[in-house]
């Protein structure tokens, strides 16, 4: 489990990205890079890290399920993810 402070910080970043999305888009279209530079750093979408929705783990996250590989494996074995089953050949 990730630290709660890290998860909260990431959530705050997501809110900032959403808040400044339209303004950032307009400034990029105009080419006003000076105004872009004055926006908060955390409003840039490149600063976001994909995190597991279950554990908050930042690494090894499967995009489709928004879960870390470890949490995905546990939930899949329990049959809690619809349409996913262990394959064998």
From Swiss-Prot:
Signal sequence, renumbered to the chain = none
* This protein's record includes keyword Transmembrane helix: no
Please tell me whether the keyword Aminoacyl-tRNA synthetase is annotated for this protein.
Answer: no
Which Gene Ontology terms of cellular component type are present?
Answer: cytoplasm; small ribosomal subunit
Q: By its UniProt entry, which Pfam families does this protein fall under?
A: Ribosomal_S14
Q: What keywords sit in the KW lines?
A: Ribonucleoprotein, Ribosomal protein, RNA-binding, rRNA-binding
Q: GO molecular function terms here?
A: rRNA binding; structural constituent of ribosome
S-S pairs: none
Q: Name one GO biological process term.
A: translation
InterPro entries, sorted: Ribosomal_uS14, Ribosomal_uS14_bac/plastid, Ribosomal_uS14_CS, Ribosomal_uS14_sf
Tell me which family the UniProt entry assigns to this protein. Answer: Belongs to the universal ribosomal protein uS14 family.
NCBIfam families in UniProt: PRK08881.1 (NF006477)
So what does this one do?
Binds 16S rRNA, required for the assembly of 30S particles and may also be responsible for determining the conformation of the 16S rRNA at the A site.
What binding partners and quaternary form does the record give?
Answer: Part of the 30S ribosomal subunit. Contacts proteins S3 and S10.
This chain belongs to the protein called Small ribosomal subunit protein uS14A
What species is this protein from?
Staphylococcus aureus (strain NCTC 8325 / PS 47)
The taxonomy runs: Bacteria, Bacillati, Bacillota, Bacilli, Bacillales
């Amino acid at each position: 489990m990730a630290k709660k402070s890290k998860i909260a910080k990431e959530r705050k970043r997501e809110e900032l990205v959403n808040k400044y999305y339209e303004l950032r888009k307009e400034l990029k279209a105009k080419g006003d890079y000076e105004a872009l530079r004055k926006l908060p750093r955390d409003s840039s979408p490149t600063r976001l890290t994909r995190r597991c929705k279950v554990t908050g783990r930042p690494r090894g996250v499967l995009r489709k399920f928004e879960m870390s590989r470890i949490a995905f494996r546990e939930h899949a074995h329990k049959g809690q993810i619809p349409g996913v089953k262990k394959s064998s050949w």
